[in-house]
Design a protein with these regions (language model features):
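Thiamine diphosphate
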Residues: 1-40, 58-61, 68-197
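Short glycine-/polar-rich loops that comprise or flank the Walker A/P-loop
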Residues: 12-15, 47-48, 164
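Acidic/polar loop patches that form or flank catalytic/metal-binding clefts of enzymes
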Residues: 15-19, 49-53, 73-77, 137-140
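Conserved glycine-bearing catalytic or ligand-binding loops at nucleotide- and phosphate-handling centers
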Residues: 53-61, 65-69
Length: 197
């Protein structure tokens, strides 16, 4: 697939690619069906947009974005997991997410922890936040990391907030996420192949 995707990017073709076995959480077939490196690999191809929407509502916006593309291929990653539609703190999230990321759970402007999460890890982060008492936790859905990083610094700071600690949650390799955290222990990623089910 990679050679044809690269040619589509070079040719500025608005192809849409769907990746169905996203994440390491499913896949009784083991590491052959757990694409831990795919997110990073797709993000590094020039002129390719890679979307990893968190729930069904984000997926609808991702489809809109893909259909609006006129000069680059769009890749969307979906999972076989059952993901619930969650409430969004940002009431204008449908527009904000078009800049790559938006706030799902607010916390405050000065959260103790900001969790940057993608796809099924957004719901996982929301559930994890419920288990932590006494902490002000902001959760951000990063549907398009590359697009988010193209935004001006003030927007990025507004989304991440003045958190004492930033944590990343993505079911893939940590490549490209290191700059957001102060310690590797805050990377909830996987830098190895999975195991058989």
């Amino acid at each position: 697939l990679r050679p044809s995707l690269r040619v589509a990017a070079l040719s500025k073709l608005p192809n849409i690619y769907i990746f169905t076995h996203d994440s390491i959480y499913v896949g009784e077939d083991g590491p052959t069906h757990q694409p831990v490196e795919t997110n990073a690999a797709l993000r590094c191809i020039p002129n390719v947009q890679f979307l990893r929407p968190g729930d069904a509502e984000e997926s609808a916006v991702a489809w809109e974005m893909a259909l609006e593309s006129t000069n680059h291929p769009v890749c969307m990653a979906f999972t076989r997991q059952a993901i619930t539609v969650y409430e969004k703190a940002d009431k204008d999230w449908r527009n904000t997410v078009r800049k790559g990321a938006y706030i799902v759970q607010e916390g405050t402007k000065n959260p103790d922890i900001t969790i940057l999460a993608t796809r099924s890890e957004v719901e996982m982060s929301l559930n994890a936040a419920k288990l932590v008492s006494g902490k002000n936790i902001r959760i951000v859905s990063v549907m398009d990391k590359t697009l988010f990083e193209k935004q001006d610094e003030s927007f990025q700071k507004e989304i991440i907030g003045n958190a004492k600690r930033v944590v990343v949650a993505e079911a893939g390799v940590s490549f490209g996420w290191e700059k957001y955290v102060s310690s590797k222990k805050d990377l909830f990623t996987i830098d190895r192949f999975g195991e058989s089910g």
